[in-house]
Design a protein with these regions (language model features):
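Short S/T/G/P-rich N-terminal loop/turn motif that feeds into the first structured element of a domain
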Residues: 18-227, 233-264
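Bacterial Sec-dependent N-terminal signal peptides
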Residues: 1-20
Length: 264
């Protein structure tokens, strides 16, 4: 079984013991080049693998709805310091692993050409941020099946200054509780913004099928002419801006092998 619980769970759950860090990169890839890009991503992720890496795991989502990017990748570290140190280690591993392949001149030229194209796409067509796990926002990772693709909603919140406690109180009593009790949600997690372009809070809600996602949305529908309850009013009064996206979790790094794999 692919060890995806280790990939995601270590970031979102074991942060109870340490403040785990996620380095997040958003890639804007032309649609006609998307399949080749993700194949190259798998190849060069594998070629950058080594026992010396400080990377704890990683995952990739395909963008489905809202915003304007193709893929988003998550690399997980114990600290910002480990993140900063890992780049040179990855570069050294890439060189060592390519040398070990003992490629012919023609094969090496082809690989170099592919890498340069992959690297150019990343350099010119991405933006990034660093986030920190919030363990109090996690639910059900130990029982979720991380060997399968996930339909994922990402809710982004910018919180009004000084209203973080009220935000979390309202969120836990409302949305968090409702999702756990709905019968359609498989897992939930969240993170704080640390560096780069991003909102204060990200909330990830995972569904194991489009049917369950649709059923949850249907069950959550409400009468737009009816006033909110008191908890909802208090919660939304803390929010300065909010937006939602839909993603598809498609694969990650197996921490046992260090290799990238695609979900089924």
């Amino acid at each position: 079984m692919k060890n995806i619980f280790t990939v995601l769970g270590l970031f979102f759950i074991s942060s109870l013991m340490a403040q785990s860090i996620a380095s997040i990169a958003y890639y804007k890839v032309p649609r006609e080049e998307a399949a080749q890009f993700i194949r190259s991503h798998q190849k060069f992720t594998d070629l950058s693998s080594s026992d010396d890496r400080l990377l704890r795991g990683g995952g990739v989502f395909a963008h489905v709805h809202a915003d304007n990017y193709t893929y988003v990748s998550y690399d997980f570290y114990d600290s910002v310091s480990d993140l900063e140190k890992d780049g040179p280690i990855a570069s050294a591993a890439l060189k060592t692993n390519i040398d070990a392949l003992k490629l012919s001149k023609k094969e090496k030229e082809a690989l170099t050409k592919e890498y340069r194209k992959y690297n150019r796409t990343i350099y010119y067509n991405h933006y990034d941020q660093i986030r920190m796990a919030n363990p109090e926002m996690g639910w059900n990772f130990q029982t979720a099946d991380w060997t399968k693709k996930k339909i994922t909603t990402l809710s982004k919140f910018k919180i009004k200054e000084g209203m973080q406690d009220q935000f979390f109180d309202g969120w836990k009593k409302g949305e968090f509780k409702n999702k756990q009790e709905s019968g359609f949600v498989e897992a939930i997690t969240g993170s704080w913004h640390l560096y780069g372009e991003g909102d204060n809070i990200h909330v990830y809600t995972f569904f194991d099928s489009w049917d369950n996602f649709a059923s949850f949305e249907k069950a959550s529908s409400y009468d737009v002419t009816k006033d909110m309850g008191e908890n909802e009013k208090k919660f939304w009064s803390t929010v300065e801006t909010h937006e939602d996206e839909i993603l598809m979790f498609i694969g990650g790094i197996d921490q046992t092998t260090g290799k990238f794999y695609f979900e089924k």
